[in-house]
């Protein structure tokens, strides 16, 4: 499967800046190539619950209704195990959600679009792009 899996920080930017860099980039590619992970959706919904903002939740739900949210499934578990072991052996562990998102992208052969390139660049074989490039 070719395409792009949008990370939490990228979707958050789309919510804050609907006409920003990410939206512009999406406008230049096939929108069917865009998706996100259920882990990202969970992080976004957690952020809304923590803020207690119905308005923000409505914006998140509206965007997630447009962007396909992919379920986490086999073979992401095998990818997760390999990635986690490799990073821990190297003394460079990352957060649990980041691991799941990376494993999801790797398992599906997707490029992870993230502003968190410092963390995700440690993962061998994970294709990453930063559409925010600050």
Give the positions of each predicted feature.
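Nucleotide phosphate-binding site architecture
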Residues: 11-12, 42-45, 70, 121, ...
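Generic structural signal for small/hydrophobic residues in well-ordered secondary structure
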Residues: 7-8, 22, 44, 80, ...
């Amino acid at each position: 499967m070719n395409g792009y899996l949008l990370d939490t920080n990228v979707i958050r930017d789309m919510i804050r800046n609907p006409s920003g860099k990410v939206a512009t980039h999406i406008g230049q590619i096939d929108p069917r190539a865009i998706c996100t992970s259920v882990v990202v959706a969970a992080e976004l919904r957690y952020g809304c619950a923590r803020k207690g903002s119905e308005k923000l939740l409505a914006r998140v739900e509206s965007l997630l209704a447009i962007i396909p949210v992919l379920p986490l499934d086999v073979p992401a578990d095998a990818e997760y195990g390999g990635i986690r072991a490799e990073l821990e052996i190297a003394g460079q562990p990352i957060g649990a959600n980041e691991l799941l998102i990376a494993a999801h992208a790797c398992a599906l052969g997707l490029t992870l679009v993230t502003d968190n390139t410092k963390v995700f660049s440690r993962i061998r074989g994970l294709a990453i792009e930063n559409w925010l490039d600050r």
